[in-house]
């Protein structure tokens, strides 16, 4: 009986803790921040036209010629695009 009460109490504490973490995530949604505050954009996120460094990682480059989307979005770079980004000396990783 004592074990069941402890287990039930632990589950309640876990549920309350996970709810508060979700609330914080909703409040600080990285997609709602302007790109300058984010530092860099993940793949398939909006980026700055002509600035491959606005996309995170070595794999990301800014693509403004997507056939189904208006605007510029980060995409996975090809081999030559990766090399060009490496020589640009982007600060973000």
UniProtKB/Swiss-Prot annotation:
Residue numbers covered by the propeptide annotation in the UniProt entry: 19-38
Main location: secreted
Tissue: Expressed by the venom gland.
Signal peptide: 1-18
Localization per record: Secreted
Post-translational modification: Contains 5 disulfide bonds.
Protein name according to UniProt: U12-lycotoxin-Ls1c
Keyword annotations: Disulfide bond, Secreted, Signal, Toxin
Family statement: Belongs to the neurotoxin 31 family.
Molecular function GO labels: toxin activity
Lineage, broadest ranks: Eukaryota, Metazoa, Ecdysozoa, Arthropoda, Chelicerata
GO cellular component: extracellular region
Entry annotated with the keyword Signal: yes
């Amino acid at each position: 009986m004592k074990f069941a009460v402890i287990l039930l109490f632990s589950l309640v504490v876990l549920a309350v803790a996970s709810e508060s973490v979700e609330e914080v995530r909703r409040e600080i949604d990285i997609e709602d921040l302007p790109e300058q505050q984010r530092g860099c954009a993940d793949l398939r996120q909006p980026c700055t036209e002509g600035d491959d460094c606005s996309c995170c990682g070595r794999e990301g480059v800014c693509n403004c010629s997507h056939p189904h989307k208006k605007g510029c979005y980060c995409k996975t770079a090809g081999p030559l695009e990766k090399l060009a980004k490496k020589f640009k000396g982007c600060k973000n990783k």
